[in-house]
Amino acid sequence: VAFDEYKVKPQKGDLFMTRIGDIGTCAIINSNDDLAYYVTLSLLRPNKRVLNSRFLKYVIESKYGKKELNRRILHTANPIKINLGDIPKIKLYLPSLQVQEYIVSILDKFDTLVNDIKSGLPKEIEERQKQYEYYRERLLSFKKS
């Protein structure tokens, strides 16, 4: 079967979101390569003029996003799932694109610090070293009598 026969092809910047089982886990598509995906995933294509893909990912994976998804889950299904038609019903607060990009830049930095052992761990060690030196100097600085 040729990819041309499919209605929707994933594009760079789109998101895959799990919709069966572990609902709401997202991945951003980083290339325009032809991809096939299974029914357990939904393809989300944000309107780039009003919605940043990374912002959408962070919102969906937040407590708020999980709560919104949970309101539309078919809890009687086994495994639990959300219907494709219910995904657009999720209520999202959309700040301006500029604010979204600012929020994403902050969250990306935290994500790197927490999840990237090559940059996060050395940065954490450096910060703890500074903290140690600060407290050492404070604790060992005695007033002259």
Region locations from a protein language model:
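Charged, alpha-helix-forming regions
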Residues: 1-145
